[in-house]
């Protein structure tokens, strides 16, 4: 019986940023991971060699550009270049977490770069034929690329876990800030039009602590905070305190990308947050894996099905409408 690899000449390669995720994707697809050397020379420069024939193959390279962002981005670029020079049919950059995505505009016309566009231009210029990513920080970032972008959503995975772990009785979806209202509303709608609350953060004047106003009734309810990424977790933990002070019985958070930099794990351990559920778009640190409040879901099946649909020329948008 022919496999997907036999039928479509499909191959999956990995950088070093998240090999366990790549291995899980390959298992879901029923293909083996492509053979390659991805290392560094003694002076720190990237060293890449594709160790098998890829001529006329449809290749997918899995590499999130998480920390160390510059190294992982450069690694992705040189892998793509090596594959293009080896005469592949096409290369899809599978970037589960697109680093630099928060640097997507010039705030107040400051003299700063739009680094998300710089990274997108580099990936386009090196020869990637398309990009597959999950939950971009802003959908408009797709326009920074000069190649097609499939931005799929982790919400089906997160929603299924919410249904399974918490049900919908006495549940309310909470946006941690005004900017996340669209995402939170979409999640609430998928949970049977459950209630929605918004946290409005305001600093009354300079040197005065930020005040968190809760828009919505959370008293006696299980609050589900939703967002695309968690970094130091300061805002998330402050939101949990505000919700508990307003009578919430339980506060959990469902967030796609676990950046978890700096004091994030300590903040979560010492917070009012009951549980933080994340995905494996970014590998967890040892400290995060040992944290009893953090639970991780896998996007491997989601990405594998998307890769399969791309390889067979099937619709992706019909599967991941959000």
From Swiss-Prot:
| Residues that coordinate or bind Mg(2+) 1 | 137
Concerning Pfam families, the annotation shows: Pribosyl_synth, Pribosyltran_N
Q: Which InterPro entries match?
A: PRib_PP_synth_CS, Pribosyltran_N, PRibTrfase_dom, PRTase-like, Rib-P_diPkinase, Rib-P_diPkinase_bac
- The residues responsible for catalysis, as annotated, are 201
Name a single GO biological process.
5-phosphoribose 1-diphosphate biosynthetic process
Q: What is its EC number?
A: 2.7.6.1
Cofactor: binding comment: Binds 2 Mg(2+) ions per subunit.
Q: Do you know which Gene3D superfamilies this protein is assigned to?
A: 3.40.50.2020
- Residues that span the membrane, as ranges: none
Cofactor entry: Mg(2+)
Q: Which GO terms describe its cellular component?
A: cytoplasm; ribose phosphate diphosphokinase complex
Provide the GO MF annotations for this entry: ATP binding; kinase activity; magnesium ion binding; ribose phosphate diphosphokinase activity
Question: Which domain of life does this protein belong to?
Answer: Bacteria
In which pathway does this enzyme or protein participate?
Metabolic intermediate biosynthesis; 5-phospho-alpha-D-ribose 1-diphosphate biosynthesis; 5-phospho-alpha-D-ribose 1-diphosphate from D-ribose 5-phosphate (route I): step 1/1
UniProt KW keywords: ATP-binding, Cytoplasm, Kinase, Magnesium, Metal-binding, Nucleotide biosynthesis, Nucleotide-binding, Transferase
> Which residues are involved in binding D-ribose 5-phosphate?
203, 227, 231-235
Annotated positions binding Mg(2+) 2: 177
**Chief localisation class:** cytoplasm
Please write the reaction equations for the catalytic activity of this protein.
Answer: D-ribose 5-phosphate + ATP = 5-phospho-alpha-D-ribose 1-diphosphate + AMP + H(+)
| Locations listed in the record | Cytoplasm
Q: Family, per the entry?
A: Belongs to the ribose-phosphate pyrophosphokinase family. Class I subfamily.
The cross-references to PANTHER family, in alphabetical order and at most eight, read:
RIBOSE-PHOSPHATE DIPHOSPHOKINASE FAMILY MEMBER, RIBOSE-PHOSPHATE PYROPHOSPHOKINASE 1, CHLOROPLASTIC
Assembly, in brief, is:
Homohexamer.
Q: What does this protein do?
A: Involved in the biosynthesis of the central metabolite phospho-alpha-D-ribosyl-1-pyrophosphate (PRPP) via the transfer of pyrophosphoryl group from ATP to 1-hydroxyl of ribose-5-phosphate (Rib-5-P).
Q: What is this protein called?
A: Ribose-phosphate pyrophosphokinase
Q: Which gene encodes it?
A: prs
